[in-house]
Amino acid sequence: MYNGILPVYKERGLTSHDVVFKLRKILKTKKIGHTGTLDPEVAGVLPVCIGNATRVSDYVMDMGKAYEATVSIGRSTTTEDQTGDTLETKGVHSADFNKDDIDRLLESFKGIIEQIPPMYSSVKVNGKKLYEYARNNETVERPKRKVNIKDIGRISELDFKENECHFKIRVICGKGTYIRTLATDIGVKLGFPAHMSKLTRIESGGFVLKDSLTLEQIKELHEQDSLQNKLFPLEYGLKGLPSIKIKDSHIKKRILNGQKFNKNEFDNKIKDQIVFIDGDSEKVLAIYMVHPTKESEIKPKKVFN
């Protein structure tokens, strides 16, 4: 039985669910879950939690992501990416803008921004996914969402051809960010229709492309009984949270029994959630949170016996 976090390289054409389904067959275990959906046409890092590590999948999702995308100015689509039907075209020429204009524009997207999610997305409105409305040719008001663009920059020259302009960007962002919406919004600010023509996730949950294995590689390693060495411990998925190392055996016992604590029993300031780590084994003991009605107390959220 495997336990840990496995960074998978999801190839284009597969859904995130396909990856989980195939892994369950390869590894012969049902206790597998991914950490955030990647669209079928997007390749890149998809961390998968196996065994006990499924309990930390939410925390892996919260750790942020990085992408490399191609923005295509001059044509918009129904899906905001290359898979959709054309909505609008407007010829783009090298006299319309230059790379300095693009760089200044990209700077304006840094920080907390508002996005309207694409109609072809899994965001739910009134209990129904937006893509379900879109497939039925129904329109529905989409809620604006705040997302965090930690960094964004151009990583290629501008390529003007066939009345369009293409360039690559790298984006570091928080969860819930739609890069294809970012591409269309870049076009709006330039005064042109636009879409995202290619996307690769280069980092997710602290895992990068070089950490990631294809399904074929995973199958081979499993057959050679050497896959466990490639799994990251579940503690890795909690590195985005503050932690305290516990040496005292009495306190360890209280934590594992799920007892409440007063904040002032610890030297560290506890603002929201805290991970207790066994000071001897370096294994996670529990995740605690501030008590919702008693600010001076912390209570267990997840205990790892």
Swiss-Prot record:
<feature type="active site" description="Nucleophile">
    <location>
        <position position="39"/>
    </location>
</feature>
<comment type="similarity">
    <text>Belongs to the pseudouridine synthase TruB family. Type 1 subfamily.</text>
</comment>
<keyword id="KW-0819">tRNA processing</keyword>
<keyword id="KW-0413">Isomerase</keyword>
<dbReference type="Pfam" id="PF16198">
    <property type="entry name" value="TruB_C_2"/>
</dbReference>
<comment type="function">
    <text>Responsible for synthesis of pseudouridine from uracil-55 in the psi GC loop of transfer RNAs.</text>
</comment>
<dbReference type="InterPro" id="IPR014780">
    <property type="entry name" value="tRNA_psdUridine_synth_TruB"/>
</dbReference>
<dbReference type="GO" id="GO:1990481">
    <property type="term" value="P:mRNA pseudouridine synthesis"/>
</dbReference>
<dbReference type="InterPro" id="IPR020103">
    <property type="entry name" value="PsdUridine_synth_cat_dom_sf"/>
</dbReference>
<dbReference type="Pfam" id="PF01509">
    <property type="entry name" value="TruB_N"/>
</dbReference>
<dbReference type="GO" id="GO:0003723">
    <property type="term" value="F:RNA binding"/>
</dbReference>
<dbReference type="InterPro" id="IPR032819">
    <property type="entry name" value="TruB_C"/>
</dbReference>
<dbReference type="GO" id="GO:0031119">
    <property type="term" value="P:tRNA pseudouridine synthesis"/>
</dbReference>
<dbReference type="GO" id="GO:0160148">
    <property type="term" value="F:tRNA pseudouridine(55) synthase activity"/>
</dbReference>
<dbReference type="InterPro" id="IPR002501">
    <property type="entry name" value="PsdUridine_synth_N"/>
</dbReference>
<protein>
    <recommendedName>
        <fullName>tRNA pseudouridine synthase B</fullName>
        <ecNumber>5.4.99.25</ecNumber>
    </recommendedName>
</protein>
